[in-house]
Amino acid sequence: MENTQENPTSQNPTPADETARQAAEAAAPQQEAAANAATDSPVNAEQSALAEAEAKIAELQESFLRAKAETENVRRRAQEDVAKAHKFAIESFAEHLLPVIDSLEAAVAHSSDDLQKVREGVELTLRQLTGALEKGRVVALNPVGEKFDPHRHQAISMVPAEQEPNTVVAVLQKGFVIADRVLRPALVTVAAPK
């Protein structure tokens, strides 16, 4: 059932009710202003924090782009340096070989019937070539008497010998290393086990 009876105070306000209503109406704009101020303060603070964060992001992005560009430049320069090193790595070695070529050309141009002079010229040229190879860090392996090393030697045969087993007895073809890397293993004969 519906309540047909109305609140008597809602239709006939008392003087105390009227005073309370007026006080509430007067206080409402102040409360609203205080609420707006309270909400404006956090909004302003948030906006300034957001602006600071955006400025920091822009600064970091600029720093990142500069660092990225610098990294790319360093990488490009390093690639160019490596390419130049590959291109001209043999230059110094070739310079050391030029006197050998000069000696061989002089020997070919000068014909001599004296076999001893030809031999001396060939020996001199061989010394020049060996010196040029050594300056290029190419060194001959002469492993006679050493223990057989499969990384530096290639055994052609095993022969009975007085030396310890697996010792290099003879070198059939010299091996060469370049800066501790085997360029060509030495072809050797090895002492057989007794």
Swiss-Prot record:
According to its UniProt record, where is this protein located? Answer: Cytoplasm
CDD domains with a match to the protein in the record: GrpE
- The reply on keyword Cytoplasm is yes
User: Spans of biased composition, class Polar residues?
Assistant: 1-14
Q: Pfam families under this entry? A: GrpE
**Which residues fall in a compositionally biased region of kind Low complexity?**
21-38
Q: Name one GO molecular function term.
A: adenyl-nucleotide exchange factor activity
Location of the region described as Disordered in the Swiss-Prot/TrEMBL record: 1-50
Q: Which GO terms describe its cellular component?
A: cytosol
* Keywords, ordered alphabetically: Chaperone, Cytoplasm, Stress response
Q: Which InterPro entries match?
A: GrpE (IPR000740), GrpE_coiled_coil (IPR013805), GrpE_head (IPR009012)
User: Which Gene Ontology terms describe the biological processes this protein takes part in?
Assistant: protein folding
What does the protein in this record do? Participates actively in the response to hyperosmotic and heat shock by preventing the aggregation of stress-denatured proteins, in association with DnaK and GrpE. It is the nucleotide exchange factor for DnaK and may function as a thermosensor. Unfolded proteins bind initially to DnaJ; upon interaction with the DnaJ-bound protein, DnaK hydrolyzes its bound ATP, resulting in the formation of a stable complex. GrpE releases ADP from DnaK; ATP binding to DnaK triggers the release of the substrate protein, thus completing the reaction cycle.
* Subunit description: Homodimer.
Q: Extract the NCBIfam families matched here.
A: PRK14139.1, PRK14140.1, PRK14150.1
Can you tell me which family this protein belongs to?
Belongs to the GrpE family.
Annotated protein name in UniProt: Protein GrpE
Species name for this entry?
A: Paraburkholderia phytofirmans (strain DSM 17436 / LMG 22146 / PsJN)
